[in-house]
Amino acid sequence: SVIEVIETRIGGISDLRSQVAPKQVDRLVEIACHRFHAVMQSKPVHDILNGKITEWYLFSRLHKTKLGKYKLHISPDLVWFSGKTCHLLRFTVQGVSKPGDDKHLENVAMVEWAMQQKGLPANYERYIVENLYWNNGRWKLWRKRCTERDLEDSKHMINSDMRAMID
């Protein structure tokens, strides 16, 4: 079982053994492997692995970005270039079938992060914002070119949300 493999690697008894049935752990790992193999076949990951996308970078969402008086986690997971266009992608392990405006604007905030980074375009028009999300048994890709209105609406939403949390 997966728990036995974990225990061999850690050299002791895993806390999982008392919390989750071994068959349930095995099933969760099977699901994770299915998702992993599926994402390897999805765009843009497949294009990176096949060399169609040659200029790409990974970033940590743990990096904070200053937006006004707030420090936020708004960086993308993956950035790549296609000509002069810069793509900003975030992975969502469990997404909804039709992301609402709030999720769209949350993703647009990645452009704020990008425009503060050395080596990335300073012009919002050069960005395509993307989200690769898992829904109904497959990976789906949402994408949209950034507009000035999107960027302003994103900043407004973030400021409203932050004020609501502080009040």
Regions found by a protein language model. Give the residues of each.
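Serine/threonine-rich low-complexity intrinsically disordered regions
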Residues: 1, 12-15, 21, 98, ...
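Mg2+/Mn2+-dependent nuclease catalytic core
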Residues: 55-151
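Accessory terminal regions of nucleic-acid processing enzymes
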Residues: 3-7, 11, 152, 156-167
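Catalytic cores of nuclease domains that cleave nucleic-acid phosphodiester backbones
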Residues: 5-90
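Generic detection of long, well-ordered alpha-helical segments
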Residues: 22, 26-33, 101-105, 148-155
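Hydrophobic, Leu/Ile/Phe/Ala-enriched alpha-helical segments that form helix-helix packing faces
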Residues: 32, 36-44, 111-119, 162-166
